[in-house]
């Protein structure tokens, strides 16, 4: 583990696909980064790239050569490269989000996205089945749009489907991938097709592309479900809820540990429902539109997940279930 004072070594946050301004994953992590810098007096900056996936090794090696003492990497596809690079720079500390990588100077941060997504799928299905709610078909038909076909994104989607089918075993969940995290126009087009095809609620797991999903929900008079941050206010009344993933807390905590020379090298930090690392938003603009019984049912499911009575499938650890192959 690298030992350095704040004055000696600055820190960097490597921004993932979709970039800053996505009003989602990257922006929330960056908010935590800025807060952590202010609280610790560390010096640091975000690192962006036009092709963050293809340039993984170049990005990580340049940042390491530049003298950063800590690199926090938000890009899922960088995992293997980061583990390799970390071996060549033993005096630099590295953090990778959303997967486990080994190394004395590597810390891994995992989120139990499947748990929050389970609750999102359950709520979406309960609401879609209720024709008394404006815009809902009365049928258990919902959708989800992922930013890319990867196990990291499918972790959300599998949990969402499991939650939907916990409410109604015959629930239909339309699944599509935008193959892009920064194009709202694609998100709007794909979500419109889902709404036109009968979906009443569409969950976006596509970063900035998902902003188009929210726009499509507003245009169709349906519901979107936001992700990572509380996106309910982006289209008040048309974002049913958001599956919040507290990347801000994770990044801020790592910075504090680093500043205190307590960097968790070689360790994995896991944040799920139990740690308030994931969960649904307060539904500020929609709670009064949804029957209290539906909200209570979702809350009961949350308690059962916390108690272990409901076990949510983790696609990263368990592979894919039969219903998603």
Segments from the language model and where they lie:
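A residue-level marker of the well-folded mature domains of exported/periplasmic proteins
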Residues: 4-325
């Amino acid at each position: 583990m690298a030992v350095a004072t704040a004055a000696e070594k600055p820190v960097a946050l490597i921004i993932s696909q979709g970039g800053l301004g996505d009003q989602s994953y990257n922006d929330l992590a960056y908010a935590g980064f800025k807060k952590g810098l202010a609280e610790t007096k560390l010096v640091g900056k975000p690192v962006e790239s036009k092709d963050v996936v293809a340039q993984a090794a170049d990005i990580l090696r340049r940042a390491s050569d530049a003298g950063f003492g800590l690199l926090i990497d938000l890009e899922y596809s960088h995992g293997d490269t980061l583990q390799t690079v970390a071996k060549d720079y033993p005096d630099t500390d590295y953090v990778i989000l959303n997967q486990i990588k080994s190394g004395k100077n590597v810390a891994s941060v995992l989120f139990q996205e499947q748990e929050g997504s389970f609750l999102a799928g359950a709520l979406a299905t309960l609401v879609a089945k209720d024709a008394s709610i404006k815009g809902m078909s009365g049928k258990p038909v919902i959708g989800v749009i992922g930013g890319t076909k990867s196990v990291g994104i499918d972790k959300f989607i599998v949990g969402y489907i499991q939650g939907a089918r916990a409410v109604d075993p015959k629930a239909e969940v339309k699944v599509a991938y935008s193959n892009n995290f920064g194009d709202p126009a694609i998100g709007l087009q794909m979500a419109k097709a889902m709404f036109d095809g009968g979906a009443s609620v569409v969950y976006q797991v596509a970063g900035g592309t998902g902003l188009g999903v929210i726009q499509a929900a507003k245009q169709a008079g349906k519901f979107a479900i936001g992700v990572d941050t509380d996106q309910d206010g982006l289209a008040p009344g048309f974002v049913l809820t958001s599956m919040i993933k507290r990347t801000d807390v994770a990044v801020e905590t790592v910075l504090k540990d680093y500043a205190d020379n307590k960097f968790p090298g070689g360790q994995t930090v896991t944040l799920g429902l139990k740690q308030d690392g994931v969960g649904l938003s307060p539904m500020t603009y929609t709670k009064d539109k949804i029957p209290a019984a539906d909200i209570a049912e979702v809350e009961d499911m949350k308690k059962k997940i916390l108690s272990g009575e409901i076990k949510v499938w983790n696609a990263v650890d368990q592979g894919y279930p039969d219903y998603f192959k």
